[in-house]
């Protein structure tokens, strides 16, 4: 299956699945459209919306809730299981090293096959149809959302912020909220643990005052999802987009040297001013609270606006779950499971519960082999990439379905002695957006070992035997069920 070409093709795909509704009456991006999109998701309706008339922005359209269903996302990416996407990168790392010439050639072929996911430079892009610069280039052209009444302004809520890493030269493409602060200024909120902030810090250390940058709005589903993924540094985000898409991403070089997806709807070209640091917020984020950071953030200065004919603006809305970002979080959970299993082979499965707001809570099942294995897994997970920002982690045995919260609750209730099995890690780094920490970015973590205990962990005793029905009686009841007249 060829990857879906762009946002427009993806909307057509959604419409073919009866997952798209069109709104032909005029609607405003200031509070009104965000309220509509939230209401749809809170009702459990689960469909995308295309607003064909946008108040104050003639010629623009707005798409929202485009990631409304994990299964539809899977179909759009053409895979039977979302884990396949992660396996494309990490499966070649598993298994014994090849010894014979045949095995070595196969291994080389697997490595070389990654080349098909590399970005492909092209000389044409649809967004070059319209180029505005000088006085004409303005954030006011863009139908950016004001999501909540007390937000600090209008926000680009799903712009793919492009900056090149100053050390390795790889491309970062992250979803960082951008508060519009003027005609040509936007404040870029990248959190301290993210790759964008790393690029800022490295650039400052090198004595640079600005970073060439681009804000990309609207692309194919695989590329849009990649922007929100916690891709480990220094993997190039354009390369990872190719892995998600199943084919290399076509990219176009802007005058400032930044390569951007050629299928973009809107491109805002400019630079990050590292010396112009400003306040940002408040903004109503995915925890369901207004976030007003205490630190300052760099300013994006707009130089050019590029856009396709009748461009489609895509923006997400945030707030208490479940909203569209829940699907994006579940997508990350699935595609990074193979990576977690490569580093921690004992891991069987993982679940980030929707109301755990991504990094609030995780359930992980493991195949336990020795005393203390549950705590070993907890400590490893607490130090693993973006999972290290997770506040509460519960580890259970391999036979517990982590996607069934009732099974997890049963495991915690029946397997946990709080003094023995609860681990509190104080004075650690935390999610910068967590409203519960007394000091931003610095708090504590909770680990719960809800595995069955081995004798060494249980005072030398054997763990109690679990109840199980008599097999012969089960067969008897199954055979006579119709006689009982119960259903």
UniProtKB/Swiss-Prot annotation:
| GO cellular component terms listed in the entry, alphabetical order | cytoplasm
Q: Which SUPFAM superfamilies match?
A: FMN-binding split barrel (SSF50475), UbiD C-terminal domain-like (SSF143968)
Checking Pfam families in the record gives: UbiD, UbiD_C, UbiD_N
Query: What's an example of a GO molecular-function annotation for this chain?
Result: carboxy-lyase activity
InterPro entries reported for this sequence? UbiD, UbiD-like_C, UbiD-like_N, UbiD_Rift_dom
Q: What domain of life is recorded for the organism?
A: Archaea
NCBIfam families referenced in this protein's UniProt entry, alphabetically? UbiD family decarboxylase (TIGR00148)
Family statement drawn from the similarity comment of this UniProt entry:
Belongs to the UbiD family.
Question: Can you say what this protein is called?
Answer: Uncharacterized protein APE_1571.1
